[in-house]
């Protein structure tokens, strides 16, 4: 049995030395140290030995097994190291090579326009107010002087979720909530950017979802001249100092009087062209003095406080500013289109 163990040890060590791959070493381990290997068989046969021989043979078996396992571990370590060194040799990095340029992302034109508009009004002392896109009918309509039976509701075809819940049709709902939540009923000066939803057929100038930015100022002694002056500053900041504005009478349930504002055409400079349909003017937003009913419903004394409000579509402003002829370009994720608006 002793000679058998020495023979097994010598043969196993030779096979380990000859192995060139990890798989070969694993085969040796299974063949010699596995449950069905010869060393295990020797252990099972030790029961036939005398009590005097058993301790000596047990120690010899352990010595042989440890010698094989130690050589296996050393060889496995050497092979793994060789594999890593070979891989590193083939994947050597030349640190002197120039780096690859980083592709810069595109600033989406709508994001750019909204940020520019916010910057203009923040510079005039406004705060940015945001609200939920899923809104109650009350704040979207009733609090804005549009009771349930008001015919002006037909001006906006609405996505209703339940009878009293809807996707907001304008960010005026944020204004209504801001006025109501102003416990002191003091001055307010906010702009409200956000997505709004209407059941419009998508075409070159309409979308069922679009970005709207509305503004609200509430204070004592607010006049129409304050509204006009504010809009003049906005237009010159967004479209250039040479832009002129024109206010036309209009109707909105939540303002009285109401106006629509046009700017002088940037293509023909007011002379008349295809862009402005020969008028020399382009409509960009609606505005007016806050209706007394809206103030009263929010808890304000309409005899003491007045206000003005305005609202515009970010897509409309972006189309005019960048010369885009189809609103759908903003939502098709066409990289060729978006790359035109990379930041310098």
Swiss-Prot record:
Keyword Iron: yes or no?
no
Q: Which residues bind Mg(2+)?
A: 256
In terms of domain of life, where is this protein from? Bacteria
Q: Where in the cell is it found?
A: Cytoplasm
Which N-terminal stretch is annotated as signal sequence?
none
Q: What cofactor is needed?
A: Mg(2+)
Protein EC: 6.1.1.20
Identify the PROSITE patterns for this entry: AA_TRNA_LIGASE_II
UniProt keyword annotation of Nucleotide-binding present:
yes
Q: Which Gene3D superfamilies match?
A: Bira Bifunctional Protein, Domain 2 (3.30.930.10)
**Catalysed reaction equations from the record:** tRNA(Phe) + L-phenylalanine + ATP = L-phenylalanyl-tRNA(Phe) + AMP + diphosphate + H(+)
Name the UniProt key words of this record, in alphabetical order: Aminoacyl-tRNA synthetase, ATP-binding, Cytoplasm, Ligase, Magnesium, Metal-binding, Nucleotide-binding, Protein biosynthesis
InterPro entries, alphabetized:
aa-tRNA-synth_II (IPR006195), aa-tRNA-synth_II/BPL/LPL (IPR045864), Phe-tRNA-synth_IIc_asu (IPR004529), Phe-tRNA_ligase_II_N (IPR004188), Phe_tRNA_ligase_alpha1_bac (IPR022911), Phenylalanyl-tRNA_Synthase (IPR002319), tRNA-bd_arm (IPR010978)
Q: How is the cofactor bound?
A: Binds 2 magnesium ions per tetramer.
User: What Pfam families does the record point to?
Assistant: Phe_tRNA-synt_N (PF02912), tRNA-synt_2d (PF01409)
Name the GO terms of the biological process aspect. Answer: phenylalanyl-tRNA aminoacylation
| CDD domains in the cross-refs | PheRS_alpha_core
One Gene Ontology CC term in the entry: cytoplasm
Q: Which family does it belong to?
A: Belongs to the class-II aminoacyl-tRNA synthetase family. Phe-tRNA synthetase alpha subunit type 1 subfamily.
Q: How does it assemble?
A: Tetramer of two alpha and two beta subunits.
Q: What is this protein called?
A: Phenylalanine--tRNA ligase alpha subunit
Q: Which organism is it from?
A: Bacillus cereus (strain ATCC 14579 / DSM 31 / CCUG 7414 / JCM 2152 / NBRC 15305 / NCIMB 9373 / NCTC 2599 / NRRL B-3711)
